[in-house]
Design a protein with these regions (language model features):
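NAD(P)H-binding glycine-rich loop region in Rossmannoid oxidoreductase-like domains
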Residues: 36, 47-86, 94, 112-114
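Catalytic helix-loop patch of NAD(P)-dependent Rossmann-fold dehydrogenases
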Residues: 82, 117-166, 190
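Conserved Rossmann-fold NAD(P)-dependent oxidoreductase catalytic core, especially the SDR/UDP-sugar
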Residues: 90-134
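Conserved C-terminal active-site "lid" loop/helix of NAD(P)H-dependent oxidoreductases
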Residues: 202, 237, 260-301
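Substrate-positioning beta->alpha
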Residues: 141, 171-177, 191-213, 219-220
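N-terminal Rossmann NAD(P)H-binding glycine-rich loop of SDR-like oxidoreductase domains
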Residues: 3-23
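Mid/C-terminal beta-alpha module of Rossmann-like enzyme folds, strongest
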Residues: 212-276, 311-315, 321-326
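Amphipathic terminal alpha-helices
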Residues: 291-298, 302-326
Length: 326
């Protein structure tokens, strides 16, 4: 088959492309930049450009829509709508133009509220979405667009994967930032670290996306997180131990952390610079952000890696020479 991956030069897209290439599929890796790993399969195009999407999808059988605007410091915030909602609409336009009937779409658990309906087990797919930020709102609106598309033709298949924070070699998201701060000795635990986090390793995420090719006609919605969840203290301790340090390191009261975050927010507005610390990042760091991923077991998918395997691999690839005190 010929398979298109929007965001195909990203770290999830690259891992997925490797699995698909191994099976002999032809790829169209659509991104704003050329794939370093698969340059011959790259198509430079912007998901916000409808004509470019239609041209890029010529001859495609299946679309993986991974491209998104997801940073939490985007300005203007309207870019979330432009890229995530408008980009999704353009992908659908391309699917209709070329008679493509299968779309696999990565959404986000940011569509759920910070406080889940089931605090013990986390939000599941039956719970009412209630996004807590502009990013989550845009992903929910994009989901609705794809949900409408799948009902238009009985031959259509939609797999929507609500992803938690995903980490792995090559990623420069929040988990990398945390690891980098720990490795450089600049990290201090905010709060007592008892809050739990649902996270996922890129090797498992790409494996499930690959597995999603086997799902039949209709609409399929899944939360994805690698289990069991870790609390923040255990998570930080695991990273520190992999870097040759003991324990969770220094700690700061939550109220003091919020005050510090507000100072950085003011500085960001005055200077126009982006800082690694903000109120929203501190709140997210200290909150329980867990989801229920039990439903995914119905697909018979088995994650090939444990969370420990994933953390060890990322630290080995990104920080193996780092031995600074923390």
């Amino acid at each position: 088959m010929k398979i298109a991956i929007t965001g195909g030069a990203g770290f999830i897209g690259t891992q997925l492309a490797g699995l698909l290439t191994a099976e002999g599929h032809e790829l169209a890796l659509i991104d704003l930049k050329k794939s370093e790993t698969f340059p011959n399969d790259s198509i430079i195009a912007d998901v916000t450009n409808r004509d470019a999407m239609i041209d890029a999808m010529d001859g495609v059988d299946v679309i993986y829509h991974l491209a998104a605007e997801h940073r939490d410091d985007v300005s203007p915030v309207s870019r979330y709508t432009t890229v995530n909602v408008g980009g999704g609409e353009n992908v659908i336009a391309a699917a209709k133009a070329h008679g493509i009937h299968k779309i696999i779409f990565t959404s986000s658990v940011a569509v759920y509220p910070l406080v889940p309906e089931d605090p013990k087990n986390g939000s599941n797919e039956t719970h009412t979405p209630a996004p807590f930020n502009d990013y989550g709102t845009s992903k929910l609106e994009s989901e609705k667009t794809f949900d409408a598309w799948v009902t238009e033709d009985e031959k259509n298949t939609l797999v929507t994967m609500r992803l938690v924070a995903t980490f792995g070699p090559g990623n420069r998201g929040n988990i990398y930032t945390l690891m980098n701060q720990i490795a450089s000795g600049k990290f201090m635990m905010i709060g007592d670290g008892s809050n739990r986090k649902s996270i996922a390793y890129v090797g498992n995420v790409s494996a499930f996306l690959h597995h999603a090719l086997t799902l039949k006609n209709g609409s399929h919605l899944y939360n994805y997180a690698d289990k069991p969840d870790l609390n923040m203290r255990d998570f930080v301790t695991s990273i520190r131990e992999a870097l040759g340090h003991k324990g969770a390191g220094p700690q700061m009261p939550y109220a003091v952390g919020l005050l510090g975050g507000s100072v950085f927010d003011v500085a960001a507005k005055i200077t126009g610079r982006k800082f690694p610390i903000s109120i929203i990042r501190i709140k997210k760091f200290c909150a329980d952000t867990i989801v229920n991923a039990d439903k995914i077991q119905d697909t018979k998918f088995k994650a090939p890696y444990s969370l420990h395997d994933g953390l060890s691999e990322m630290i080995k690839c990104e920080f193996q020479t780092t031995k600074k005190a923390a």
